[in-house]
């Protein structure tokens, strides 16, 4: 027995497009009819007359064939339009009877378990902070959590059934002063398959220097077997901003970790920290990226930027997530970049996040994640950020991650930056076969000492050592990084330039 799956709206759209194509071709044929079917002879001789008659005959034959094709095209469009209407009518006619059948199927499960077999969970009402309802036991998405009242948390998203996606968490309630509500957690994905729900955003707080923003809700975990984790919620804006929520973990067999939520913007105390990325599926899956740290804008005082979130760990076969960038400190220090996530067995480590620019001290770059135990390259360290002015201090670059034991190159160290130049990060160590990572360059000082270059990572068996990072210029210059030792079959890395 064969089955047909169709979408009436798509069929109707295709029929409309085909009708437009037919109209365009018909217009072109009509415009070409007169000049091509009445070709004049080039001269009065018999050959010219015969050639003109030949070309005119071909054009007349084409016009006759085009008329037949236009008729067929019109009939086809009519049939397609009628089919779309028939499918739509059949859907409308069957909706009410099937809904009654579904109610009969769900009634015993609702009576015994308070949950249907098939169907989506109800959404929480806005402003109540009510949790979203769970989806059907067999098939169904979880309902979204309701947003919180003023200063109250948002509701959690409902969990899915065997198949389905988790519901999103509700947003925390905003307040004019005081502490805002935190975001609700996202619901878990289906037991067999489904994505976790996103965490709700933290509430915003006013009230000048005393307001505290709500933290973003954590993302829901992916399905137990397959599914991506939900993203963490964004932290709320306030004088003391809320942190971003952590991303949910991926499914057991396969799934990508959810991204961490961004930290909220801080207006006086500090920017919120970025949420950590969720871990990838235990077997296959990449770790989620860390959330970006919130900026410190300091309308009323000083406020450093928030640190970036760490990247999630990869699965047995998967890469680590990148660390989040640190927040900018407009009147304060920049936030540190988050560290990259490490892989477990076979895969590359995640890159470290860049530090946030600061008006005083720049944020340090995050360390690169380590590669899988056997095979993979270490993640690159994040770049340190610029510190403001001649008295500022640049952030140090993050260290590169270590490679896998058997194969892989070490990660490169991050670059430092000035005021007083930040030091370059160390290059990561290589595996048995692979090159060491290069050290990061030191930052140039602005009326201050330059940053030292990072040392190159060493190789073990087959591979070259990483080059040392160049010294940053300044008063005085920084020291150059030393090259890493080469393997038994390899060269030593070059020292950095002074």
From Swiss-Prot:
Similarity comment: family membership:
Belongs to the mycobacterial PE family. PGRS subfamily.
**How is this protein's activity kept under control?**
Binding of Ca(2+) to PE_PGRS33 induces conformational changes and increases affinity for TLR2.
Q: Which Pfam families match?
A: PE (PF00934), PGRS (PF21526)
**Keyword Chaperone applies:** no
- List every stretch annotated Interacts with TLR2: 140-260
Question: In practice, how is this protein used?
Answer: PE domain induces protective cellular immune response and PGRS domain induces humoral immune response during infection in mice, suggesting that this protein is a promising candidate for the development of M.tuberculosis vaccines. Immunization of mice with the PE_PGRS33 protein stimulated CD4(+) and CD8(+) T-cell proliferation as well as IFN-gamma secretion, supporting the potential use of PE_PGRS33 as a vaccine candidate for tuberculosis.
Complex formation: Interacts with human TLR2.
What this chain does, per the entry, is described as: Induces TNF-alpha release through human Toll-like receptor 2 (TLR2) signaling pathway, leading to macrophage apoptosis. The signaling pathway involves TLR2-dependent activation of the mitogen-activated protein kinase kinase kinase 5 (ASK1), which activates the p38 and JNK MAPKs, leading to enhanced expression of TNF-alpha and tumor necrosis factor receptor superfamily member 1A (TNFRI) genes. Signals are amplified through classical caspase 8-dependent mitochondrial release of cytochrome c, leading to the activation of caspases 9 and 3.
Supply the source organism for this entry: Mycobacterium tuberculosis (strain ATCC 25618 / H37Rv)
Cellular component, GO annotation: cell outer membrane; cell surface; extracellular region; peptidoglycan-based cell wall
The answer to whether UniProt assigns keyword tRNA processing to this entry is no
Q: Where is this region: Essential for translocation to the cell surface?
A: 1-30
**Protein name, please?**
PE-PGRS family protein PE_PGRS33
Q: Where is the PE domain?
A: 1-93
Q: Which UniProt keywords apply?
A: Calcium, Cell outer membrane, Cell wall, Membrane, Secreted, Virulence
Q: What happens when the gene is disrupted?
A: Deletion mutant is strongly impaired in its ability to enter macrophages. Deletion does not affect the intracellular growth in macrophages.
Q: What induces it?
A: Constitutively expressed in vitro, suggesting that it could be an essential gene. Expression is regulated by SigA. Down-regulated during stationary phase, under nutrient starvation and oxygen depletion.
């Amino acid at each position: 027995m064969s089955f047909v799956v169709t979408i009436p709206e798509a069929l109707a759209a295709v029929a409309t497009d085909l009708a437009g194509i037919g109209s365009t071709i018909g217009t072109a044929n009509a415009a070409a009819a007169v000049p091509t079917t009445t070709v004049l002879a080039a001269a009065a001789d018999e050959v010219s007359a015969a050639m003109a008659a030949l070309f005119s005959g071909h054009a007349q034959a084409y016009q006759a064939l085009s008329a037949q094709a236009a008729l067929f095209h019109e009939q086809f469009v009519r049939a397609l339009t009628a089919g779309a209407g028939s499918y739509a009518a059949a859907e409308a006619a069957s909706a009410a009877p099937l809904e009654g059948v579904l109610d009969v199927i769900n009634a015993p499960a609702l009576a015994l378990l308070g949950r249907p077999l098939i169907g989506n969970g109800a959404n929480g009402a806005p402003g109540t902070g009510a949790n979203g309802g769970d989806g059907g036991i067999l098939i169904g998405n979880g309902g979204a959590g309701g947003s919180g009242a003023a200063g109250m948390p948002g509701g959690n998203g409902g969990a899915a059934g065997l198949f389905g996606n988790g519901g999103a968490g509700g947003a925390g309630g905003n307040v004019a002063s005081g502490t805002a509500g935190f975001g609700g957690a996202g619901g878990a994905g289906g037991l067999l398959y489904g994505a976790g729900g996103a965490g709700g955003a933290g509430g915003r707080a006013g009230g000048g220097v005393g307001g505290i923003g709500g933290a973003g809700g954590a993302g829901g975990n992916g399905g137990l077997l397959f599914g991506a984790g939900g993203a963490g919620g964004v932290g709320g804006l306030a004088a003391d901003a809320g942190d971003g929520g952590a991303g949910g973990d991926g499914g057991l067999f396969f799934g990508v970790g959810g991204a961490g939520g961004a930290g909220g913007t801080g207006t006086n105390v500090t920017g919120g920290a970025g949420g950590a990325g969720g871990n990838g599926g235990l077997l296959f899956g990449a770790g989620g990226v860390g959330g970006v740290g919130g900026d410190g804008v300091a309308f009323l005082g000083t406020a450093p930027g928030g640190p970036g979130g760490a990247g999630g760990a990869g699965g047995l076969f998967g890469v680590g997530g990148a660390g989040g960038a640190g927040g900018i400190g407009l009147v304060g220090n920049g936030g540190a970049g988050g560290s990259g996530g490490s892989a477990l067995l076979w895969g590359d480590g995640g890159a470290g996040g860049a530090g946030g620019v600061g008006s005083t001290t720049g944020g340090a770059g995050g360390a690169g994640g380590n590669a899988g135990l056997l095979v993979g390259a270490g993640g690159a360290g994040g770049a340190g950020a610029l510190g403001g002015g001649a008295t500022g201090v640049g952030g140090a670059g993050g260290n590169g991650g270590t490679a896998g034991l058997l194969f892989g190159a070490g990660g490169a160290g991050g670059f430092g930056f000035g005021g007083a130049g930040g030091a370059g990060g160390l290059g990561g160590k290589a595996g048995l076969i692979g090159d060491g990572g290069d050290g990061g360059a030191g930052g140039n000082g602005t009326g201050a000492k330059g940053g030292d270059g990072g040392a190159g990572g060493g190789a073990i068996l087959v591979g070259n050592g990483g080059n040392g990072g160049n010294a940053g210029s300044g008063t005085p210059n920084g020291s150059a990084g030393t090259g890493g030792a080469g393997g038994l079959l390899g060269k030593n890395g070059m020292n950095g330039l002074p």
